[in-house]
């Protein structure tokens, strides 16, 4: 009676676990019902049942062999894919090598027109540049070079020989090199040999406002420049 009471006082222990993961039983050699049935089918009727330790070791060995077989089966499946990769690379590599010179020729063909266009632009600019540049006017003829005689005294008018003051000498000096009085200082009054109209055109061209090439391409709001 004392032994029975001590056994009842003990906590219930967990059943043994089968190698497959399910709960086993001591009656079925610590195996689940399915594993125990498979084990009985494999064992012949005449042979005696082995011990529990041997059965467990056999099950573990079978599981390890099955795992090894699975790994051996899966490994060959990867090898063909790995072997196919170099073949694909070998197939694609000639295409890239063949396309290499094609791309070089394409680059050359694309670059050559740009060089020609730059040359054409430079020629057009050189042709247009003389039009924009002002014409050079020859130096005015000196009194010595022209058929007219040299003025002896700058204190008197070259046309009427009237005496001139200092202010009249400064105001009456002409670009042809002679000094005239107030009555003959205009070019029409003393038959001036200097090309005043050509000089005026030249000065107008020099003072002309040159338009910037960027005009019309940039956007600017009205009133931004004033702020």
UniProtKB/Swiss-Prot annotation:
The keyword Zinc-finger applies. Zn(2+) 2 binds at residues 157, 160, 181, 184. A zinc finger (A20-type) spans 12-44. Residues 49-59, 66-77 have a biased composition (Low complexity). The keyword Transcription does not apply. Residues 78-96, 113-127 have a biased composition (Polar residues). Zn(2+) 1 binds at residues 18, 20, 32, 35. InterPro entries: AN1-like_Znf (IPR035896), AN1_A20_ZnFinger (IPR050652), Znf_A20 (IPR002653), Znf_AN1 (IPR000058). Expressed in testis. A zinc finger (AN1-type) spans 151-200. GO terms for molecular function: DNA binding; zinc ion binding. Residues 41-99, 113-151 are annotated as: Disordered. Zn(2+) 3 binds at residues 174, 176, 190, 192. Residues 135-148 have a biased composition (Basic and acidic residues). It comes from the Eukaryota. Keywords: Metal-binding, Zinc, Zinc-finger. PANTHER family: AN1-TYPE ZINC FINGER PROTEIN (PTHR10634), AN1-TYPE ZINC FINGER PROTEIN 3 (PTHR10634:SF67). This is AN1-type zinc finger protein 3. It comes from Mus musculus.
């Amino acid at each position: 009676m004392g032994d029975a009471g001590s056994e009842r006082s003990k906590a219930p222990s967990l059943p043994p676990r089968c190698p497959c993961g399910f709960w086993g039983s001591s009656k079925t050699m610590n195996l689940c019902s399915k594993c125990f049935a498979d084990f009985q089918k494999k064992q012949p009727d005449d042979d005696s049942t082995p011990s529990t330790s041997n059965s467990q070791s056999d099950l573990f060995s079978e599981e390890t062999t099955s795992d090894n077989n699975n790994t051996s089966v899966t490994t060959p499946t990867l090898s063909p894919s790995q072997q196919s990769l170099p073949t694909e690379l070998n197939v694609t590599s000639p295409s890239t090598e063949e396309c290499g010179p094609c791309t070089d020729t394409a680059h050359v063909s694309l670059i050559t027109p740009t060089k020609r266009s730059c040359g054409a632009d430079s020629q057009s600019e050189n042709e247009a540049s003389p039009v924009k540049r002002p014409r050079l006017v020859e130096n005015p003829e000196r009194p010595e070079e022209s058929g007219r005689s040299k003025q002896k005294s700058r204190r008197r008018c070259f046309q009427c020989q009237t005496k001139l003051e200092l202010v009249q000498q400064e105001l009456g000096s002409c670009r042809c090199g002679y000094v005239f009085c107030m009555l003959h200082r205009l070019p029409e009054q003393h038959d001036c040999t200097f090309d005043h109209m050509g000089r005026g055109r030249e000065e107008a061209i020099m003072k002309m406002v040159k338009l910037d090439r960027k005009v019309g391409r940039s956007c600017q709001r009205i009133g931004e420049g004033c702020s």
